[in-house]
């Protein structure tokens, strides 16, 4: 397959390098278009007030294009401008840190895959439950095996497959679990400190309370040791809410 590969940790991150190797070793034709700098948690932001610049990276068997923008920028630019032959699949990852539950909304990794899906391409987002991974070669090979089955062919358009790996070797993981995202949200707070010039700064931290997790959710199963798979569908309107509001307000939805 011809694959567009991107991420949000940046083009020099371990995750994208090891996923690239897994895909290349499996015989795929891979074009990398990824942010030059760290873009974690930028969501689906795009750049509209400054130009995007592209730099080629060729090193240690890796070849890719670094883009001075967000993950969604990378996908949009690649699919409209950089790629002469359009891809069969958009893959984003492997992210350093899981993207489960509400993290899906914050994630540049998932948003890059979503941009691909919105533009009409099958898309897979891949993350590892480890904020400082040093070796994701096994996970990269797993992804190559996973996409060989072309699971997206059974799905509706604009669907993203969200794949997450637990922090353990592949041989020690529990079976792949198909599961919904947790509905639990973070308890957030900011740590306030002072810089060397005496000015306050604020650093976000937070946790999802374990007691708020349902046992069948992505976060709970990932923590238990499963590889998790969640299909995400980005339909912007809530059909049930449309019907409820129509009844409540006496409005028609067919005008």
Curated annotation (Swiss-Prot):
Its cofactor is a divalent metal cation. The keyword Metal-binding applies. Binds 1 divalent metal cation per subunit. Its main location: cytoplasm. Its EC number is 3.1.3.5. Pfam families: SurE. It catalyses: a ribonucleoside 5'-phosphate + H2O = a ribonucleoside + phosphate. The keyword Nucleotide-binding applies. It comes from the Bacteria. GO terms for molecular function: 5'-nucleotidase activity; metal ion binding; nucleotide binding. It is found in: Cytoplasm. It is an enzyme of class 3 (hydrolase). One of its GO terms (cellular component) is cytoplasm. Keywords: Cytoplasm, Hydrolase, Metal-binding, Nucleotide-binding. A divalent metal cation binds at residues 8-9, 40, 95. Belongs to the SurE nucleotidase family. Nucleotidase that shows phosphatase activity on nucleoside 5'-monophosphates. NCBIfam families: surE. PANTHER family: 5'-NUCLEOTIDASE SURE (PTHR30457), PHOSPHATASE, PUTATIVE (AFU_ORTHOLOGUE AFUA_4G01070)-RELATED (PTHR30457:SF0). This is 5'-nucleotidase SurE. It comes from Solidesulfovibrio magneticus (strain ATCC 700980 / DSM 13731 / RS-1) (Desulfovibrio magneticus). The lineage of its organism: Bacteria, Pseudomonadati, Thermodesulfobacteriota, Desulfovibrionia, Desulfovibrionales.
